[in-house]
């Protein structure tokens, strides 16, 4: 399964042939090798074994904390994914999906009871690459990029959040729903920091949905990353086409209002989100998502990247459409977005400030809370990168039914602490101090 399946041709080697001559009475008269055995190739993965182990444990533990009420309120959290990616190379340092499974149980035949248990919990389903989810407010950086690059706004443009948005179906910012007044005048950096829905509703009104879709695609959303694992999904980025296909009705302004805060038909995998955040962190540079550091033959010769790609693409049926080009955007655009993401974690009013205010390092992040359409359940996202000034890693965490993105942030914090070798200060009681979180924040 997994990477072993993809790289089977490189790993298995070739059997040798030994010929044995025998006399009529069964006596061996000669023995020699007619074909030498060829050892399999050596595959070095990008995965950091210690970080992988820690990431799996941190994800599992925090899901259980949410489900048990350790953070103050019980949620139906029962599944999720977490990814750590090198923002400069696209190398995967850790990739976890929960619930997971024990591969060794399949070697001698898994019991029907255990298999039924796995099927019920979708343990064999890799949520990091196969799960597609509405991104919630983590999508706002796409909308911000589109607005700045199309000239819809500048970095100095201010929009007054009065609470209830006056157009369309009159949606309210989460802040108004919670506190009964708006954020007031905000610029784009502040709108990202405070995750102001009203601000982004207005951007949707001013520029429409087409530029948003265009820049979502430029960030690689809705498009497979080409990671060397089977089962990767595309997601949904062609929002207007999909709307027409499933409803038979053309796209409406109300759909735009929902889409710009990461709802509507937006649907992306955690691995796509990790690539997207990495591109924000590295200044928009193209990266190739990969699990393979190197493959060498039995004599120590390194196999070319091109040859490996051809083999993997053929095995998994991948074409070159997974390649995302470097973003052709103004330097100021991504710099402004990064500042907004820094404010999320380091400035009062930032939606993850209560979690990261004591982190000891400047980082950037964005929370996201996305309605699932099922019994008022909300998935939680945290996407971010660190360090802020010279980014090394992007961390993406998705927890199903977490209640909010704020509830997902502690998982990302602990993963970052594990990567940087910090003495992880478990965030438990402190999380109860976070204001209750509304949808799409």
Model-based region annotation:
Residues 1-40, 57, 274, 346:
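Small/polar-residue-rich segments within soluble enzyme cores
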Residues 23-34, 47, 80, 87-137, ...:
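Beta-lactam-recognizing serine transpeptidase/beta-lactamase-like catalytic domain environment
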Residues 28-80:
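Conserved, well-ordered alpha-helix/loop/beta-strand core segments that scaffold catalytic motifs
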Residues 48, 52, 273, 404-413:
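Short, charged, low-complexity patches
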Residues 52, 66, 132, 401-404:
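Short strand->helix junction
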Residues 61-69, 98, 343, 421:
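Conserved helix-loop functional segments at active or binding sites
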Residues 281, 413-424:
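Short amphipathic alpha-helical signal-transduction/dimerization elements
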Residues 428-441:
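Short, highly charged C-terminal tails/helix-capping segments
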């Amino acid at each position: 399964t997994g990477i072993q399946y993809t790289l089977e041709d490189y790993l298995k080697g070739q059997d040798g042939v030994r010929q044995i001559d025998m006399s009529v009475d069964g006596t061996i008269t000669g023995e020699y090798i007619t074909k030498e055995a060829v050892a399999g190739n050596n595959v070095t993965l990008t995965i950091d074994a210690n970080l992988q182990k820690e990431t799996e444990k941190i994800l599992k533990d925090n899901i259980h904390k949410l489900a048990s009420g350790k953070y103050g309120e019980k949620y139906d959290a029962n599944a999720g994914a977490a990814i750590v990616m090198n923002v400069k190379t696209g190398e995967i340092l850790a990739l976890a999906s929960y619930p997971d499974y024990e591969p060794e149980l399949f070697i001698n035949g898994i019991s029907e009871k255990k298999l039924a248990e796995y099927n019920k919990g979708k343990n064999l389903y890799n949520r990091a690459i196969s799960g597609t989810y509405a991104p919630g407010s983590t999508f706002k950086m796409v909308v911000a990029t589109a607005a700045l690059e199309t000239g819809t706004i500048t970095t100095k443009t201010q929009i007054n959040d009065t609470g209830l948005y006056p157009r369309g179906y009159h949606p309210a910012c989460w802040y108004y729903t919670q506190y009964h007044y708006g954020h007031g005048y905000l610029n784009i950096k502040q709108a990202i920091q405070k995750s102001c829905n009203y601000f982004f509703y207005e951007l949707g009104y001013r520029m429409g949905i087409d530029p948003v879709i265009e820049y979502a695609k430029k960030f690689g959303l809705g498009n497979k990353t080409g990671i060397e694992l089977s089962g990767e999904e595309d997601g949904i980025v062609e929002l207007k086409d999909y709307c027409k296909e499933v409803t038979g009705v053309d796209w409406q302004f109300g759909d735009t209002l929902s889409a710009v805060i990461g709802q509507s038909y937006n649907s992306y995998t955690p691995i796509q989100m990790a690539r997207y955040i990495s591109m924000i962190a590295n200044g928009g540079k193209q990266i190739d998502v990969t699990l393979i550091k190197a493959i060498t033959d039995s004599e120590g010769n390194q196999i070319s990247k091109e040859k490996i790609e051809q083999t993997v693409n053929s095995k998994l049926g991948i074409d070159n459409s997974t390649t995302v080009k470097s973003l052709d955007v103004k330097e100021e655009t991504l710099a402004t977005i990064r500042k907004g993401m820094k404010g999320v974690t380091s400035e009062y009013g930032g939606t993850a400030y209560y979690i990261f205010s004591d982190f000891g390092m400047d980082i950037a992040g964005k929370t996201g809370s996305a309605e699932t359409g099922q019994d008022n359940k909300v998935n939680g996202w945290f996407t971010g990168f660190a360090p802020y000034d010279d980014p090394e890693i992007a961390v993406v965490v998705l927890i199903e039914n977490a209640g909010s993105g704020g509830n997902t942030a502690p998982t990302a914090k602990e993963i970052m602490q594990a990567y940087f070798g910090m003495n992880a200060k478990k965030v438990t009681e402190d999380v109860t101090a976070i204001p209750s979180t509304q949808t799409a924040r």
